[in-house]
UniProtKB/Swiss-Prot annotation:
<dbReference type="GO" id="GO:0006207">
    <property type="term" value="P:'de novo' pyrimidine nucleobase biosynthetic process"/>
</dbReference>
<feature type="binding site">
    <location>
        <position position="247"/>
    </location>
    <ligand>
        <name>Zn(2+) 1</name>
    </ligand>
</feature>
<dbReference type="InterPro" id="IPR004721">
    <property type="entry name" value="DHOdimr"/>
</dbReference>
<dbReference type="GO" id="GO:0005829">
    <property type="term" value="C:cytosol"/>
</dbReference>
<feature type="binding site">
    <location>
        <position position="251"/>
    </location>
    <ligand>
        <name>substrate</name>
    </ligand>
</feature>
<feature type="binding site">
    <location>
        <position position="219"/>
    </location>
    <ligand>
        <name>substrate</name>
    </ligand>
</feature>
<comment type="similarity">
    <text>Belongs to the metallo-dependent hydrolases superfamily. DHOase family. Class II DHOase subfamily.</text>
</comment>
<keyword id="KW-0479">Metal-binding</keyword>
<protein>
    <recommendedName>
        <fullName>Dihydroorotase</fullName>
        <ecNumber>3.5.2.3</ecNumber>
    </recommendedName>
</protein>
<feature type="binding site">
    <location>
        <position position="174"/>
    </location>
    <ligand>
        <name>Zn(2+) 2</name>
    </ligand>
</feature>
<comment type="pathway">
    <text>Pyrimidine metabolism; UMP biosynthesis via de novo pathway; (S)-dihydroorotate from bicarbonate: step 3/3.</text>
</comment>
<keyword id="KW-0378">Hydrolase</keyword>
<dbReference type="GO" id="GO:0044205">
    <property type="term" value="P:'de novo' UMP biosynthetic process"/>
</dbReference>
<feature type="binding site">
    <location>
        <position position="15"/>
    </location>
    <ligand>
        <name>Zn(2+) 1</name>
    </ligand>
</feature>
<feature type="binding site">
    <location>
        <position position="13"/>
    </location>
    <ligand>
        <name>Zn(2+) 1</name>
    </ligand>
</feature>
<feature type="binding site">
    <location>
        <position position="136"/>
    </location>
    <ligand>
        <name>substrate</name>
    </ligand>
</feature>
<comment type="function">
    <text>Catalyzes the reversible cyclization of carbamoyl aspartate to dihydroorotate.</text>
</comment>
Length: 344
């Protein structure tokens, strides 16, 4: 029986939602992830230190007492965020980053930033205190094709930010294009990126060919196969600039299977198992541990986890759905087989 033991991984980008959904989302993310960067796009969003810390308390309350999972909190940036709020958040030791959502770019992003120039005093403060900037890298101009919005964002917004703030650590989250891979590779060492399991395993054909599959619909949207191959090459390259971030984003079943369905794919039920499948297919299982367990912690300036988990190559069938609050969430690979499972 083939097995793989790796240092306990972390998830550097996950959505847990709020309220009674936390009982289910925290259960899934805390099964074997040591830490996770928690997205702040709630309703209303966690725009200040106090709301982020209150959200952290609700997450901690939802996990079992013996579970050592640690939520790492994030501020939601708006046009009204102040440099003083950044300093206050950093001083807590519990808020590790601030998130740039271009207004309207994704779920619950209507309060996001309308112009990057509005943020420059805040970005200066972040660079001073050592707080990371997390970026949803898409423009929201409706005249820009949805498949081009990441590329245009890199060219028109992020390139200038990287130039203007050489001491600011920036994570370009859930990258989806060869353009983003090239951008990060050419950028200085203060720029890195997360890559999701579903963008490694799937491309837009999986979502659109032979019928629309709404559970593959996420933002940034799945791209063509050539971009998928660039992501696989980046993730398995051994470059410290790329690390695990699931962007697992739960939506109730009827909100996905709808005439105007929500964007987001749920992968927290089997995150490391999905990554293992992608890395094995690329002949790079030996690169999984660093991608999942080392590079993210190193970039954030946090210690690596010291304990381990073990995966075994034993196929199992993913349930058709999982409980979410008083409803159900349909995960990636629902009703299908997965090759790997965590056994300890």
């Amino acid at each position: 029986m083939m097995s793989l033991t790796i240092t306990r991984p972390d998830d550097w980008h996950v959505h847990l939602r709020d309220g009674i959904q936390l009982n289910d989302t925290v259960r899934d993310i805390s099964r074997y992830m040591g830490r996770a960067i928690i997205m702040p796009n709630l309703m209303p969003p966690a725009t200040c230190t106090d709301t982020a810390l209150a959200y952290r308390e609700r997450i901690v309350a939802a996990k079992t007492p013996d579970n050592q999972f640690e939520p790492l909190m994030v501020l939601y940036l708006t046009d009204n965020t102040s440099p003083d709020e950044i300093r206050k958040a950093k001083a807590t030791g519990l808020i590790h980053a601030a998130k740039l959502y271009p207004a309207g770019a994704t779920t619950n992003s209507d309060s996001g930033v309308t112009s990057i120039s509005n943020l420059y005093p805040v970005l200066e403060a972040m660079a001073e205190v050592g707080m990371l900037l997390l970026v949803h890298g898409e423009v929201t101009d409706s005249s820009i094709d949805i498949f081009d919005r990441e590329k245009v964002f890199l060219e028109t917004i992020l390139a200038q930010v990287v130039t203007d703030f050489p001491k600011l650590k920036i994570v370009l989250e859930h990258i989806t294009t060869s353009d983003a891979v090239e951008f990060v590779n050419k950028a200085p060492d203060n720029v890195a990126a997360t890559i999701t399991a579903h963008h490694l395993l799937y491309n837009r054909n999986h979502m659109l060919a032979g019928g629309i599959r709404p559970h593959f619909y996420c933002l940034p949207i799945l791209k063509r196969n050539t971009h998928q191959q660039a992501l696989i090459a980046a993730a398995t390259s051994g470059s410290k600039k790329f690390f695990l971030g699931t962007d697992s984003a739960p939506h109730l079943k009827d909100k996905k299977e709808a005439s105007c369905g929500c964007a987001g794919s749920y992968t927290a039920h089997a995150a490391i198992e999905l990554y293992a499948e992608a890395f094995e297919a690329a002949g790079a299982l030996d690169k999984l541990e660093a991608f999942a367990s080392f590079y993210g912690a190193d970039f954030y300036g946090l210690p690596r986890n010291t304990d381990t988990i073990t995966l075994e190559k034993t196929p199992w069938q993913v349930p058709d759905s999982y409980p979410l609050a008083n409803d159900r969430v349909v995960p990636i690979r629902a009703g299908e087989m997965l090759d790997w499972q965590v056994i300890s």
